[in-house]
Curated annotation (Swiss-Prot):
Name of the protein in question: Multidrug resistance ABC transporter ATP-binding and permease protein
Keywords: Antibiotic resistance, ATP-binding, Cell membrane, Membrane, Nucleotide-binding, Translocase, Transmembrane, Transmembrane helix, Transport
Name of the gene this protein is made from: lmrA
Record-listed ATP binding positions: G382, P383, S384, G385, G386, G387, K388, S389
One Gene Ontology molecular-function label: ABC-type xenobiotic transporter activity
A GO term from the CC aspect: plasma membrane
Transmembrane segment boundaries: 35-55, 79-99, 150-170, 176-196, 261-281, 292-312
Topology relative to the membrane: Multi-pass membrane protein
Length: 590
């Protein structure tokens, strides 16, 4: 699967495809916008443009009749038409603005929904900052394109074509001269647009990379500070800031040159046309009123042509955003509801000859087989990096085995819907995730239905967490801060255990939390875990000797393989490495 720079290269290589009408329409359809607003906005823009096109046509006879006096009524009508055109154009801008906001709202909702349904392996290879950039910057770029650039380009093209049509009716020779000059201007525009397209893609990719680095450092700000790594973090970001600066300079040069070059080309063309018009007047082919009317149409062209050119520039800049969003929405996501619903209680969990590797990298697990009988405790022990946590990831179905299968009561777990499976699995890790919000919100996170305060206090009791929650100023409504920074490590663990009690899982997975806790917190957490394990099928990554001794079966894992299994006393007698590991590595619990 292509990610990061590979994705950027892939998009750059297919820029034309990604900005094609087919892909663009696909992206807009995904947003499900309010098409009525778009239609009303475009129609209002068309009406405003048509009114604007009528004004120069009315000026022609008005000027030619000045020799017989000023017609106040016609002058007032011309002014009224200008005001009417401005009013209708304002209405069009407002309606299209609302349309654009509806598009970006729906698109962000769709992109966010897609992100949270992507498999875990996607997030292993894409920085969160890049994902945030897709959600914020790329969607805004698309909104600007469809709410501003496209409608303005549409009305400008209408103004351009309408002006040319009326000019042909008024004086075809002068208009023909302009039609000959237009391709010259387009030849000047083409290389500029190509350069703008390249800058736009590079800018979006660099910005996403910078946001990824910033998000990573800020999310781990305590590590940054405790490690005195501020200089390192600044230097790491400095390269990306400098890269963005260089791209910004190129973009500034591009934006700075774009308008003057286009305006110069337009003015040279217009000057030549005006000179030719004066010549036609001098030969009696054209009247002064016709020339003034033509000049007003030319003023329309001066405004319309740069707008059309800017549209192509914005389209070029948005090509990277459009490509990334389209590719993201095309990613295969997890299907939560596909499969059977099965009650896991009282059923045997088994793994048979399971292998696993991340993509094409070195194999992590080799020929893993184990069995967990109902209500039994299965312990996984072994040196760090052996693959114990990977087994848990496979059980949570974050990844698929590359060989072998995992079954429940003889049935492959892939046959069970993800939602049903995960709703019956509970996991408490060494550093359990706590979300920003209240204690109440964290306890009920991911659960449907209403829970009374009594329900919550009951699970807090079971997790030995009631006392510290009662002592907090707002109790269940206390804010715990981002990632639970306002509470201690032991308190976070006990809240996670209380959350697991509330979920009432049929299969429990534990990564014993001992290393980062003081002895008192560890004792409280262990009591809560012991209570949680009762009456459930439990798989535990063991760090305590008491857990090893109490386990119904132990699997010793080293370098991705099970090298021994059995009860504690059996392994001590038959497995020298296990005996050494127990004596040197495990915490002795009371």
């Amino acid at each position: 699967m292509e990610r990061g720079p590979q994705m950027a290269n892939r998009i750059e290589g297919k820029a034309v495809d990604k900005t094609s009408i087919k892909h663009f329409i696909k992206l807009i359809r995904a947003a499900k916008p309010r098409y009525l607003f778009f239609i009303i906005g475009i129609l209002a823009g068309i009406v405003g443009t048509l009114i604007q096109l009528q004004v120069p046509k009315m000026v022609q006879p008005l000027v030619n009749s000045f020799g017989h006096g000023v017609n106040g009524g016609k002058v007032a009508l011309v002014i009224a038409l200008y005001i009417g055109s401005a009013a209708v154009s304002a209405i069009a801008a407002i309606v299209l603005g609302i349309f654009g906001e509806s598009v970006v709202k729906n698109l962000r909702t769709r992109v966010w929904d897609k992100m949270i349904h992507l498999p875990v392996k996607y997030f292993d290879e894409v920085k969160t900052g890049e994902m945030s950039s897709r959600l914020a910057n790329d969607t805004t770029q698309v909104k600007n394109l469809i709410a501003n650039s496209i409608p303005q380009a549409f009305t400008s093209i209408l103004l351009l074509v309408g002006s040319i049509v009326f000019m042909l009716q008024m004086q075809w020779r002068l208009t023909l001269a302009m039609i000959i000059a237009v391709p010259v201007v387009m030849l000047i525009m083409f290389p500029i647009m190509t350069f703008g397209q390249k800058i736009g893609r590079t800018r979006q990719d660099s910005l996403a990379n910078f946001q990824g680095i910033a998000s990573e450092s800020l999310s781990e700000i305590r590590l940054v500070k405790s490690s005195n790594a501020e200089k390192q973090a600044s230097k790491k970001a400095e390269n990306d800031v400098n890269a963005l600066y260089k791209i910004g300079v190129k973009e500034a040069i591009f934006d700075g040159l774009m308008s003057p070059v286009m305006m110069l080309s337009m003015m040279l063309m217009i000057f030549g046309l005006l000179a030719y018009g004066i010549y036609l007047i001098s030969t009696g082919v054209m009247s002064l009123g016709t020339l003034l009317g033509m000049m007003m149409y030319l003023m329309n062209l001066i405004g319309a042509v740069p707008t059309v050119a800017t549209f192509f520039t914005e389209l070029a800049k948005a090509s990277g955003s459009t490509g990334r969003l389209t590719e993201l929405l095309d990613e295969e996501q997890e299907v939560l509801h596909q499969g059977e619903s099965l009650d896991l209680e009282g059923k045997t969990l088994s793994a048979r000859h399971v292998d696993f590797a991340y993509d094409d990298s070195e194999q992590i697990l080799r020929d893993i087989s184990f069995e967990a009988q109902p209500n039994s405790i299965i312990a996984f022990a072994g040196p760090s990096g052996g693959g114990k946590s990977t087994i848990f990831s496979l059980l949570e179905r974050f990844y698929q085995p590359t060989a072998g299968e995992i079954t429940i009561d003889g049935q492959p777990i892939d046959n069970i819907s993800l939602e049903n499976w995960r709703s019956q699995i509970g996991f408490v890790s060494q550093d359990s995730a706590i979300m920003a919000g209240t204690i109440r919100e964290n306890l009920t996170y991911g659960l449907e239905g209403d829970y009374t305060d009594e329900d919550l206090w009951q699970v807090l009791d079971l997790a030995f967490a009631r006392s510290f929650v009662e002592n907090m100023p707002d109790q269940l409504n206390t804010e715990v801060g981002e990632r639970g920074v306002k509470i201690s490590g032991g308190q976070r663990q006990r809240l996670a255990i209380a959350r697991a009690f509330l979920r009432n899982p049929k299969i429990l997975m534990l990564d014993e939390a001992t290393a980062s806790l003081d002895s008192e917190s560890e004792s409280m957490v262990q009591k809560a875990l012991d209570s949680l394990m009762k009456g459930r099928t439990t798989l535990v990554i063991a760090h305590r000797l008491s857990t090893i001794v109490d386990a119904d079966k132990i699997y010793f894992i080293e370098k991705g393989q099970i090298t021994g299994s059995g009860k504690h006393n059996e392994l001590v007698a038959t497995h020298p490495l296990y005996a050494k590991y127990v004596s040197e590595q495990l915490t002795v619990g009371q």
